[in-house]
Amino acid sequence: MEITTLQIVLVFIVACIAGMGSILDEFQFHRPLIACTLVGIVLGDMKTGIIIGGTLEMIALGWMNIGAAVAPDAALASIISTILVIAGHQSIGAGIALAIPLAAAGQVLTIIVRTITVAFQHAADKAADNGNLTAISWIHVSSLFLQAMRVAIPAVIVALSVGTSEVQNMLNAIPEVVTNGLNIAGGMIVVVGYAMVINMMRAGYLMPFFYLGFVTAAFTNFNLVALGVIGTVMAVLYIQLSPKYNRVAGAPAQAAGNNDLDNELD
């Protein structure tokens, strides 16, 4: 697939937004489900972008920046893996498997850029001492621009080179045993990521519903909409029938009416 100039510009814009979003953590544009979908729309294959994004999202659910700890770069992994799958004609499994080392490489880039922006912090301190609010604003924007370029530059390089004959020949020269291994590894990574998320979020009293969902999906022909409706109905019934949530509103008032002091006053 040959990527046009307009598509490269749009990929650059999406990559900039994702790069800034991975630092701001506010609008979640760096999440795989959003970033991959946007790249898929730009490259004309939104369906593949959604599939890659949904799969990567299951892996990256626990990836987040906490304090000084830098998480793997989901934005860089999402954008480049989507470009390789759609424009480079790689399989989705191979793209998922390649996303993990890409995320690790992006993590290193994030640490490097954050180290560089330390100088910006000192410059902002000096501007604050001088009362120069305009300089502080420009320093913040400049440091955020570096974070945007951290994702945008590698994404544009891949987008420019993935359609060339040299890169295509290199990708096609990968042995079949390696591509099959990447596909298998991609499936295993998704399972492991999903298991890690369940292990962190599991609630023992809700696990029967979890197993029931797997059995229902395996032995019926229901689509995702039907399964979602069934799950919603069961959740509502559980809340209505559970003693934890189903408390009589008049019980406290009745208990107050049986107070000995009230009886004496009567």
UniProtKB/Swiss-Prot annotation:
Pfam families the record matches: EII-Sor
Domain of life of the source: Bacteria
PTM-bearing positions, type N-formylmethionine: M1
Keywords: Cell inner membrane, Cell membrane, Formylation, Membrane, Phosphotransferase system, Sugar transport, Transmembrane, Transmembrane helix, Transport
Membrane-spanning residues: 91-124, 133-160, 177-200, 208-218, 225-242
Locations listed in the record: Cell inner membrane
Keyword flag Cell cycle: no
Cytoplasmic side: 125-132, 201-207, 243-266
Intramembrane segments: 5-43, 47-86
Membrane topology: Multi-pass membrane protein
A GO BP entry: fructose import across plasma membrane
Chief location of this protein within or outside the cell: membrane
PROSITE patterns from the UniProt entry: PTS_EIIC_TYPE_4
Disulfide bonds: none
Periplasmic side: 1-4, 44-46, 87-90, 161-176, 219-224
UniProt domain PTS EIIC type-4: residue ranges: 3-237
One Gene Ontology term, aspect cellular component: plasma membrane
Conditions for induction: Expression of the manXYZ operon is positively regulated by the cAMP-CRP complex and negatively regulated by the Mlc transcriptional repressor. Expression is also weakly repressed by NagC.
This protein's record includes keyword Transmembrane helix: yes
Domain comment quoted from the record: The PTS EIIC type-4 domain forms the PTS system translocation channel and contains the specific substrate-binding site.
Biological function: The phosphoenolpyruvate-dependent sugar phosphotransferase system (sugar PTS), a major carbohydrate active transport system, catalyzes the phosphorylation of incoming sugar substrates concomitantly with their translocation across the cell membrane. The enzyme II ManXYZ PTS system is involved in mannose transport. Also functions as a receptor for bacterial chemotaxis and is required for infection of the cell by bacteriophage lambda where it most likely functions as a pore for penetration of lambda DNA.
Subunit-structure text: Homotrimer of protomers that are composed of two subunits, IIC and IID.
Official protein name in the record: PTS system mannose-specific EIIC component
Annotated source species: Escherichia coli (strain K12)
